[in-house]
């Protein structure tokens, strides 16, 4: 593991396994103010860190969509982070944010014969909506069209997820040691973090931090956020970590590669922290294998696959 000599005295990597607690923002801010680091605005080489959805529902074992291995991911990420914080100029931290009625929740669909709603991890396919195995409770025309568009444009079926990262609930919070690290870095480097709230568009899925799977024409902000994409890629290096590798992290990477795939000199700026992210476990779908196959293709295109044990050059 990387050296963590910059970590404040109150940091303990075991906090990644501690479970929910109130983040010590004041204490970590004061520690950052005493760290004697230069302001990020003076960095000659600009480095961005994208933290995707390190939230309780994904990271804590009691979370409703717990990703196995995610606590270890956080521990490795934080160790790497405190070893390299003097080089990190910008932090982008996303928060998956949901409401009770959304197209990927069971409340949106039902079986017209039994009245039952689909269970979590059910896939809703084009055949399902054509044969009326599942019918939408809300927005019927859009919902059926969405399932078709998702298959045609994204080559995916609609997945029904457990209720997770509900706005205002504990599961929505970033895990405390991540919040503490961001507060420390903000004070130590005089750098305002960027929080990206995603997922409140009820008629579409929103995995990647830069835009929805299928943009909703009634919600302009669901379209690909090219302004943020371009801002991120103005950095000389971009490091990416978070949960889950198979979904929100992979889609974030996919959006970056999609935007800059014709510029290999920019793709080389992307660094995927592959031991700081894990995949959703599904009863029948090997999401990790699917993610690894696509990441291997991205690596061939120029994306750097790195480990947290490797310091920033």
Residue ranges and their predicted role:
Residues 1-50, 54-90, 98-313:
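Active-site-adjacent betaalpha module
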């Amino acid at each position: 593991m990387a050296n963590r000599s910059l970590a404040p005295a109150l940091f303990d990597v075991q906090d990644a396994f501690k479970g929910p607690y109130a983040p010590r923002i004041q204490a970590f801010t004061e520690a950052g103010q005493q760290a004697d680091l230069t302001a990020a605005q003076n960095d000659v080489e600009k480095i961005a860190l994208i933290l995707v959805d390190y939230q309780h529902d994904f990271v804590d074992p009691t979370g409703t969509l717990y990703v196995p291995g995610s606590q270890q991911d956080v521990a490795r990420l934080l160790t790497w982070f405190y070893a390299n914080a003097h080089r990190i100029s910008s932090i982008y931290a996303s928060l998956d944010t949901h409401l009770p009625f959304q197209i990927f929740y069971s409340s949106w669909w039902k079986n017209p014969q039994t009245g039952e709603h689909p269970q979590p991890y059910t896939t809703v396919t084009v055949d399902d909506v054509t044969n009326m195995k599942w019918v939408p409770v809300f927005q019927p025309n859009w919902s059926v069209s969405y399932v078709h568009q998702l298959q045609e444009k994204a080559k995916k079926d609609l997945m029904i997820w457990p209720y997770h990262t509900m706005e205002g609930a504990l599961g929505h919070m970033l895990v405390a040691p991540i919040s503490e690290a961001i507060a420390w870095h903000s004070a130590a480097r005089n750098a305002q973090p960027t929080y990206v709230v995603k997922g409140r568009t009820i008629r579409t899925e929103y995995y990647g931090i830069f835009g929805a799977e299928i943009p909703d024409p009634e919600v302009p902000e669901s379209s690909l956020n090219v302004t943020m994409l371009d801002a991120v890629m103005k950095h000389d290096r971009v490091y990416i970590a978070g949960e889950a590798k198979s979904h929100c992290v992979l889609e974030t990477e996919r959006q970056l590669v999609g935007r800059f795939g014709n510029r290999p000199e920019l793709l080389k700026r992307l660094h995927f922290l592959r031991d700081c992210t894990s995949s959703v476990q599904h009863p029948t779908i090997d999401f990790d294998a699917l993610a690894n196959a696509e990441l291997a293709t991205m690596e061939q295109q120029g994306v750097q696959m790195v480990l947290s044990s490797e310091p920033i050059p």
